[in-house]
């Protein structure tokens, strides 16, 4: 059984999708040890409680430095014998302490066809760009923002009559298929 921790900052829909894949047996030999969140009021906490997943709430402002924050996370991760970190809407850059402890063992999903539209509001950037396709990317995490080695991408059309909300739904649907598929192939 491979132990993973999932990091999320917001609603946690990708977190819950992964948990449901584990619970249903579609993601085999994986144990979700805990949800790690950096916001005490994030909706992902409710999703974790619904699935009886332990939650660690650690807000960086509670620590003297980013290094102290990440060292605390590493202590918790090591206590739970976590082997992989899965970022699912975690809105912070991973720093050197976490990267050193989990080198090559941190995955992220991003709602664009990287290297296009890194950072926040990638779907909005694609929508307003005039592009005719966008998609989702799973990549390894490095010290940059959405710059790690790309593992796999899936794409969808941006139709002229799509609203931004419709495009967000299309990309979310891709993410719900892509992330568990990549996790099944990579996390062993």
From Swiss-Prot:
* Residues the entry annotates as binding N(1)-(5-phospho-beta-D-ribosyl)glycinamide: 12-14
Any single GO CC term annotated in Swiss-Prot or TrEMBL for this entry = cytosol
Q: Which InterPro entries match?
A: Formyl_transf_N, Formyl_transf_N_sf, GART
- What GO terms describe the biological role, i.e. biological process, of this protein? 'de novo' IMP biosynthetic process
In short, the EC number is 2.1.2.2
Looking up Gene3D superfamilies in the UniProt record yields:
Formyl transferase, N-terminal domain
Query: A Gene Ontology MF term for this entry?
Result: phosphoribosylglycinamide formyltransferase activity
Superkingdom of origin: Bacteria
Q: Does the keyword Ligase apply?
A: no
Q: Which reaction does it catalyse?
A: N(1)-(5-phospho-beta-D-ribosyl)glycinamide + (6R)-10-formyltetrahydrofolate = N(2)-formyl-N(1)-(5-phospho-beta-D-ribosyl)glycinamide + (6S)-5,6,7,8-tetrahydrofolate + H(+)
- The UniProt record gives the binding positions of (6R)-10-formyltetrahydrofolate as 66, 91-94, 108
Active site (UniProt): 110
From the UniProt record, give the pathway where this protein acts: Purine metabolism; IMP biosynthesis via de novo pathway; N(2)-formyl-N(1)-(5-phospho-D-ribosyl)glycinamide from N(1)-(5-phospho-D-ribosyl)glycinamide (10-formyl THF route): step 1/1
Instruction: Look up keyword Transferase and say if it applies.
Output: yes
An example of a Pfam family matching this protein is: Formyl_trans_N
Q: Which UniProt keywords apply?
A: Purine biosynthesis, Transferase
**Site Raises pKa of active site His: which residues?**
146
Instruction: Report the function annotation for this chain.
Output: Catalyzes the transfer of a formyl group from 10-formyltetrahydrofolate to 5-phospho-ribosyl-glycinamide (GAR), producing 5-phospho-ribosyl-N-formylglycinamide (FGAR) and tetrahydrofolate.
Hey, which family's this protein in?
A: Belongs to the GART family.
Q: Which protein, by its recorded name, is this? A: Phosphoribosylglycinamide formyltransferase
Gene encoding it?
A: purN
